[in-house]
Swiss-Prot record:
Free-text function comment from the UniProt entry: Metalloglutathione transferase which confers resistance to fosfomycin by catalyzing the addition of glutathione to fosfomycin.
Gene symbol of the encoding locus: fosA
Domain VOC span(s) in chain numbering: 4-117
Organism ancestry: Bacteria, Pseudomonadati, Pseudomonadota, Gammaproteobacteria, Enterobacterales
Identification of the protein by name: Glutathione transferase FosA
Assembly behavior: Homodimer.
Coiled-coil regions, chain positions: none
EC number, UniProt record: 2.5.1.18
Entry's Gene Ontology BP terms: response to antibiotic
Outcome of swapping E113A: Strong decrease in fosfomycin resistance
Keywords in alphabetical order: Antibiotic resistance, Cytoplasm, Manganese, Metal-binding, Potassium, Transferase
Gene Ontology CC annotations of this record: cytoplasm
Molecular functions per Gene Ontology: glutathione transferase activity; metal ion binding
Species assigned in the record: Serratia marcescens
């Protein structure tokens, strides 16, 4: 039985640039680095940055909706969003869903999101205004 997401490994084209972005700009804790990689954490999530010479930047309009969303406290959302904008990140989407969200790219074009909210809050909003064809399968969350 699956218990949780163990780790996320992201292929990067410039390890130093990525470590600076993920550690210094986003604030993940840096635990170790080596010639071709680094281990960081965000809460209980372990993130591995792995240098890969085959990694190529993919413009957001040429890729799908797959993205990685990180929980942010409500009071930290605006300051962090502004810091990212001031750092010149590329914004790939405007928020149109429940809860505050800021959608941006990392240096390699991985789609990321800052999000204020929880699954429980999202489901409550969906119960008020369900998506087309939405069926609820449990009362949990």
């Amino acid at each position: 039985m699956l218990q949780s997401l163990n780790h996320l490994t992201l292929a990067v084209s410039d390890l130093q640039k990525s470590v600076t972005f993920w550690h210094e700009l986003l604030g993940l804790t840096l635990h170790a680095r080596w010639n071709t990689g680094a281990y960081l954490t965000c809460g209980d999530l372990w993130v591995c940055l792995s240098y890969d010479e085959a990694r190529q930047y993919v413009p957001p309009q040429e890729s799908d909706y797959t993205h990685y969303a990180f929980t942010v406290a409500e009071e930290d959302f605006e300051p962090l969003s502004q810091r990212l904008e001031q750092a010149g990140v590329t914004i790939w989407k405007q928020n149109k869903s429940e809860g505050a969200s800021f959608y941006f790219l990392d240096p390699d074009g991985h789609k990321l999101e800052l999000h204020v909210g929880s699954l429980a809050a999202r489901l409550a909003a969906c119960r008020e205004k369900p998506y087309a064809g939405m069926v609820f399968t449990s009362d949990e969350a």
